[in-house]
Regions:
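Buried hydrophobic positions in well-ordered alpha/beta secondary-structure cores of metabolic enzymes
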Residues: 23, 64, 82, 96, ...
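Short conserved active-site loop signatures built around small residues
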Residues: 1-29
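Conserved PLP-anchoring active-site segment centered on the Schiff-base-forming lysine
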Residues: 89-105, 124
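A glycine-rich helix N-cap at a beta->alpha junction
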Residues: 112-113, 117-128
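Glycine- and other small-residue-rich loops at beta-strand/loop junctions that grip anionic moieties
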Residues: 75, 99-100, 121-124, 151, ...
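Well-ordered alpha/beta subsegment
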Residues: 69-70, 95, 129-133
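Conserved N-terminal alpha-helix of the aminotransferase class I/II PLP-enzyme fold
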Residues: 34-84, 89, 105-112
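Active-site phosphate-binding strand-loop segment of PLP-dependent enzymes
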Residues: 126-159
Length: 159
């Protein structure tokens, strides 16, 4: 549920979090990678690996969720990790529309996926709404990827 507090108040108070053990007002940083494993190999604490389940992220994700009024938020170690997560939701044959000017690594990756038949891909000129409309394939277009400002040109797409 979105907070009624001003975003400045929310960020200054970090959701009013207080460490129950130390009474610290700022969440601790957890640099550890491994978590305890039980004799049967399970993870009794529920976390398996810090790269994707770091408790350091919990408060920041909760705060961003409140600030954006969303259902949830996720932090990633890089933009490419975030992009890969989005593209991983696609099924074989799904259609993707992406801008002609975009981060080169994502562009190369999308071309690779398309060349192997994993996705159908159309690139359109950044900000060209008519080209975007023309590229839409009802029933198969599952993702329209917009990068603004575009890397490396800083072209702006009005979203």
């Amino acid at each position: 549920m979105p907070s009624k507090l001003n975003p400045s108040t929310l960020t200054a108070q970090a959701l009013g979090w207080v460490d129950p053990n130390t009474r610290a007002l700022v969440p601790p940083i957890h640099p550890s990678v491994p978590y305890e494993r039980a004799p049967d190999g399970s993870y009794p604490g529920g976390r398996t690996y810090t790269r994707d389940q770091n408790p350091t992220y919990d408060q920041a994700e909760a705060l961003i969720t409140q600030l954006e009024g969303g259902a949830a938020a996720r932090l990633f170690s890089s933009g490419m990790a975030a992009a890969a997560t989005v593209f991983d939701t696609l099924s074989v044959g799904d259609h993707v529309i992406a801008p002609e000017e975009m981060y080169w690594t994502i562009r190369r990756w999308l071309h690779d996926l398309a060349s192997r038949g994993k996705i159908a891909l159309d690139l359109v000129a950044n900000g060209d709404l008519d080209a975007l409309r023309s590229a839409l394939r009802p029933g198969t277009t599952k993702l329209v990827w917009i990068e603004t400002p575009a890397n490396p040109t800083c072209a702006i797409t009005d979203i």
